[in-house]
């Protein structure tokens, strides 16, 4: 009983933290529903998806709202991964619904990302999900619903029991739940495992390998890194699950490769990638406004996921920086094997990037031609050798953004132009130097 008491107390403490950040709380046992139905659509008192859609689209009849809900419930896919990816993209991007009778179109959005207060955020524990011929049930510890859609699953382990740890929490989600209640997990892009001990509260996805679950140790970039177990629980709630931050991460920092790639992987950003993306995007926008042509420099430790950070930045520039007018991005690498490595990732990420054509460039003339054919969009990968003074300017358009991967190898005199600010753990700071360049240094010692 003692162990059970402590586990239930931890669950309650987590819910209290979520409530403090703006999540409504409901005990799953008080929600009247068919136990196989993961969406909150049946109980008149907890009918979040229908209520949200009726509030957002008052011109739709009840029958139309039911049809929209059923469209979400029956997203196709030949495998669990395909259904997860397709469902997530529908929830994130919405779709166009044509009303019966008059043919009027409605752009349905299951989440209002631009207006956080228009959404319904609900934390639920003891949420039974039935499966099998005998209607056995699984009960995830805590589920986070946005507008009645379960988008994050928490699995907790007793902090006081030595034989219960986050590896078991991982197995619970990735083996037992995936096997028994995939009809719930098809909606859940995010998962969190925790036993409230040091470095054991970690964020991932339902397709993240155990070793790649990652602690989120800062609420804001300038904060000190959380070191103690309960502090890390508070930090992940404030840094990931605060409603507006939660929507920001869902919108732009959850990555699936293109369907045609055939790869089954789902990635959520780590917190240094999140803060670096924010800072670099702001720096690029500032440089564009001030016409300095100096977007910034980002330093990351080996293995910290710099290529994914560049992908997150590119998506931000494409979708969230309207003043750039859908820029063209050129990724410059300094050797052919990097060109191949980076090219493979970006070539299978066209849907995520939202920049149109993604292409590896073979020579200078091809790059010049591609730039001349467009006023916006496009993502091109090429080596530094494609550039030389003899060919002159390739293009004078202002909204061409160049990423230089492993740039320190080709910028021998970098120190004469920028000042690097170093901080312990994971810290990112921007400093303007006399030469006008911006340096961002991230040192990763947190894993």
Give short role names for the model-derived ranges.
Residues 327-330, 391-392, 444-446:
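Short beta-alpha connecting loops at secondary-structure transitions
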Residues 336, 358-368, 383-389:
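Conserved helicase motor
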Residues 412-413:
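Conserved D-loop-proximal element of ABC-family nucleotide-binding domains
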Residues 383, 405-406:
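Walker B catalytic acidic pair
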Residues 2-328, 337, 341-353, 375, ...:
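ATP-dependent helicase/translocase motor core
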Residues 409:
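Flexible cofactor-recognition loop at the NAD(P)H-binding site
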């Amino acid at each position: 009983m003692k162990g059970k008491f402590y586990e239930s107390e931890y669950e309650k403490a987590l819910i209290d933290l979520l409530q403090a950040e703006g999540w409504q709380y409901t005990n799953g046992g008080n929600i009247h529903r068919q136990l196989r139905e993961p969406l909150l659509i049946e109980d008149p008192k907890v009918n979040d998806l229908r209520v949200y859609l009726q509030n957002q689209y008052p011109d739709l009849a009840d029958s139309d709202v039911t049809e929209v809900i059923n469209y979400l419930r029956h997203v196709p896919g030949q495998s669990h991964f395909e259904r997860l990816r397709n469902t997530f993209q529908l929830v994130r991007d919405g779709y166009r619904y044509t009303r019966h009778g008059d043919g009027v179109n409605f752009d349905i959005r299951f989440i209002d990302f631009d207006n956080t207060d228009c959404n319904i955020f609900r934390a639920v524990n003891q949420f039974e999900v039935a499966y099998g011929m005998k209607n056995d049930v699984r009960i995830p510890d805590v589920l986070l619903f946005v507008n009645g859609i379960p988008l994050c699953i928490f699995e907790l382990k007793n902090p006081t029991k030595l034989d219960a740890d986050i590896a078991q929490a991982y197995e619970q989600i990735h083996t037992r739940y995936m096997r028994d209640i995939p009809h719930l997990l098809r909606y859940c892009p995010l998962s969190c495992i925790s036993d409230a001990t040091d470095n054991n509260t970690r964020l991932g996805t339902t397709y993240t390998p155990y070793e790649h679950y990652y602690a989120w140790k800062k609420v804001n970039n300038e904060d000190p890194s959380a070191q103690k177990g309960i502090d890390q629980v508070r930090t992940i709630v404030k840094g990931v699950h605060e409603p507006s931050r939660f929507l920001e991460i869902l919108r732009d920092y959850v990555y699936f490769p293109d369907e045609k790639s055939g790869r089954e992987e789902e990635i959520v950003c780590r917190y240094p990638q999140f803060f670096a993306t924010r800072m670099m995007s702001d720096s690029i926008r500032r440089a564009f406004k001030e016409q300095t042509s100096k977007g910034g420099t980002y330093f990351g430790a080996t293995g910290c996921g710099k290529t994914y950070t560049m992908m997150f930045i590119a998506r931000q520039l494409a979708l969230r920086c309207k003043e750039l007018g859908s820029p063209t991005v050129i990724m410059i690498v300094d050797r052919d094997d990097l060109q191949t490595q980076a090219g493979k990732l970006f070539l299978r990420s066209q849907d995520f990037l939202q920049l149109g054509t993604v292409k590896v460039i073979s020579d200078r003339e091809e790059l010049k031609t591609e730039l001349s054919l467009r006023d916006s969009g496009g993502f091109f990968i090429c080596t530094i050798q494609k550039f030389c003074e003899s060919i002159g300017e390739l293009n004078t358009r202002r909204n061409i953004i160049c990423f230089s991967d492993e740039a320190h190898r080709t910028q021998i005199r970098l120190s004469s132009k920028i000042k690097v600010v170093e901080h312990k753990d994971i810290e990112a700071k921007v400093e303007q130097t006399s030469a006008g360049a911006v340096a961002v240094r991230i040192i990763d010692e947190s894993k």
